C-alpha cells in the first residue's frame, strides 16, 4: 500500500463515482410479470389517466346534487331510477336532471351526475328511490386521473421495480417493460488452501466459504454470477482475472490483498494496468480492501477473512455494483438508522469498527452476547441471521447495553 488508508466515506464516494461513469448496460424488454426486482432502463410513464373516468367508490345512486336539496329521513326526496350501472359498463346516455342512476362500486358516472349517495342513506328502491341525505357537488366521486395522471412518471429510470410498480403499470396497459440487462459479476477466491465444497477434505485445506457466500449475496440482489477459485500463484491469478473480465462486467476477489508473502493481488492489478480507486480503508475489519477500474469494469479485492469480506462487500462493492447495474444512487446505499443496543461489546475501538448485528424494532443485538471473539474477522457463523452492521466511530471505548448506535442496514 503506497497511500494512506482512506476513510469509509471517501472509499464509498470513490467507488460510487467510478460506477456512475461506466458504460450503461444494454436494455432488454421482458414481460411485465417477470419484471419484479429488475431495474427500469428508462422512465416508465402513464399512458392514460387512472382511473380513466369518474367513478363511484361505493354502491348507491348517481345523482345531480341539486336534486338532493333538503333530503333527510324526515323529508325524503323521491326520484325515478332510469338506469343501472355496474363496473365495466359504459353509460350510453347522460343522466337527466330529476333522475337517479343505480350504480355499483367502480362503475363510471353517467354524464350529468356529479355525486353518489350511498345506498345505506336510501330505501334501495329499484323503480324509484327515496333519498335520506343531501349531497354537495362532487361528493363521493373518484375523479378521472385522481390516482395517476396521463404522462406522469410511474418509475424513473434506475428504479427497482416492486410489485406495486407492476400493479400500476398493469393498470396502464403495459404488457412488457424495458429493463437493464443483469450485471454479471465474476467471483474469484484465491488461495492454495481452498477446496470446492464437493471435494474430499484434506489436511491443511479449507473449503471455499467466501466464494459461496459472496456469490449467494450477489444473486440475492439480482446479479448474474460466475464463480471460480485459484491457487496463490500470481500468473494463475492474472490469467483467471483476465478470463473473468472477458465474460463479466465486474470482478470480486477474496484473499491475497494484505502484506503477506503470497498476497499477490496488488501486483496483479498493477500488472494488468488497473486504475486504483481505493487502496485500503481505515476500518476494522476489511482494511486491506482494494477497488479499481480495469478496462471499463469494476474490480474489488476483498480480504480472505470471511467477515471482513462480507462487511466490505456490503459497504462498498454492493453499492458500486448496483450503481453500475443502473440503480438510482439512493437505492444503492445501506440505509442508516439509530438503534438501541441490547448487549455490549467489550473492546475499545481505536479506529472505525463495524460489528455484524441484527436490527429489529429500533433495537440492535450483537451475536455472541457481545463476546469479542464472535466478532473476529475470521468468524463465519456469527454472520447467520445478521441484517446490518453497527458502526463504532474511531476513538470509542467499549459500548454498553442501552447505548444508541449508528446502524447500516444491508441493501435489499
Model-derived features: where do they sit?
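Generic structural signal for well-ordered, non-membrane alpha-helical segments
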Residues: 4, 8-12, 28, 32, ...
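Helix-rich terminal scaffold detector
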Residues: 1-9, 177-302, 306-312
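Flexible glycine/proline-rich
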Residues: 9, 28-33, 37, 42, ...
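Residue-level signal for inorganic ion chemistry
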Residues: 15, 60, 151, 187, ...
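Intrinsically disordered, low-complexity, positively charged segments
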Residues: 4-72
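Short, glycine/charged-enriched hinge/interface segments at domain edges or termini
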Residues: 2-3, 62-228, 373-374, 389, ...
Amino acid at each position: 500500500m503506497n497511500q494512506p488508508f482512506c476513510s469509509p466515506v471517501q472509499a464509498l464516494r470513490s467507488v460510487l463515482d467510478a460506477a456512475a461513469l461506466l458504460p450503461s448496460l444494454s436494455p432488454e424488454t421482458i414481460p411485465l410479470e417477470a419484471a419484479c426486482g429488475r431495474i427500469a432502463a428508462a422512465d416508465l410513464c402513464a399512458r392514460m389517466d387512472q382511473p380513466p373516468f369518474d367513478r363511484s367508490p361505493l354502491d348507491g345512486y348517481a345523482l345531480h346534487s341539486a336534486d338532493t336539496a333538503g333530503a333527510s329521513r324526515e323529508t325524503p326526496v323521491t326520484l325515478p331510477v332510469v338506469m343501472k350501472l355496474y363496473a365495466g359498463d359504459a353509460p350510453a346516455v347522460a343522466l337527466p336532471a330529476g333522475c337517479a342512476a343505480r350504480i355499483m362500486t367502480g362503475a363510471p358516472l353517467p354524464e350529468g351526475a356529479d355525486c353518489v349517495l350511498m345506498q345505506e342513506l336510501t330505501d334501495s328502491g329499484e323503480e324509484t328511490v327515496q333519498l335520506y341525505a343531501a349531497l354537495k357537488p362532487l361528493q363521493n366521486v373518484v375523479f378521472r386521473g385522481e390516482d395517476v395522471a396521463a404522462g406522469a412518471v410511474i418509475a424513473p429510470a434506475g428504479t427497482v421495480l416492486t410489485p406495486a410498480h407492476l400493479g400500476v403499470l398493469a393498470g396502464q396497459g403495459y404488457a412488457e417493460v424495458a429493463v437493464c440487462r443483469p450485471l454479471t459479476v465474476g467471483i474469484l477466491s484465491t488461495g492454495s488452501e481452498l477446496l470446492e465444497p464437493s471435494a474430499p477434505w484434506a489436511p491443511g485445506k479449507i473449503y471455499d466459504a467466501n466464494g459461496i457466500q459472496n456469490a449467494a449475496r450477489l444473486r440475492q440482489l439480482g446479479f448474474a454470477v460466475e464463480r471460480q477459485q485459484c491457487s496463490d500463484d500470481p500468473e494463475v491469478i492474472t490469467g483467471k482475472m483476465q478470463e473473468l473480465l472477458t465474460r463479466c462486467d465486474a470482478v470480486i476477489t477474496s484473499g491475497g490483498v494484505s502484506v503477506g508473502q503470497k498476497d499477490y493481488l496488488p501486483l496483479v492489478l498493477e500488472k494488468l494496468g488497473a486504475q486504483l480507486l481505493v487502496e485500503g480503508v481505515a476500518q476494522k475489519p476489511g482494511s486491506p480492501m482494494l477497488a479499481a477500474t480495469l478496462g471499463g469494469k469494476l474490480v474489488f479485492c476483498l480480504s480472505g477473512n470471511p467477515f471482513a469480506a462480507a462487511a466490505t462487500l456490503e459497504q462498498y462493492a454492493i453499492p458500486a455494483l448496483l450503481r453500475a447495474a443502473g440503480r438510482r444512487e439512493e437505492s444503492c446505499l445501506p440505509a442508516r438508522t439509530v438503534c438501541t443496543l441490547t448487549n455490549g461489546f467489550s473492546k475499545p475501538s481505536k479506529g472505525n469498527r463495524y460489528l455484524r448485528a441484527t436490527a429489529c424494532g429500533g433495537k440492535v443485538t450483537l451475536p455472541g452476547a457481545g463476546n469479542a471473539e464472535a466478532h473476529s474477522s475470521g468468524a463465519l457463523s456469527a454472520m447467520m441471521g445478521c441484517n446490518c452492521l453497527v458502526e463504532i466511530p474511531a476513538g470509542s471505548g467499549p459500548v454498553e447495553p442501552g447505548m444508541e448506535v449508528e446502524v447500516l442496514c444491508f441493501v435489499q
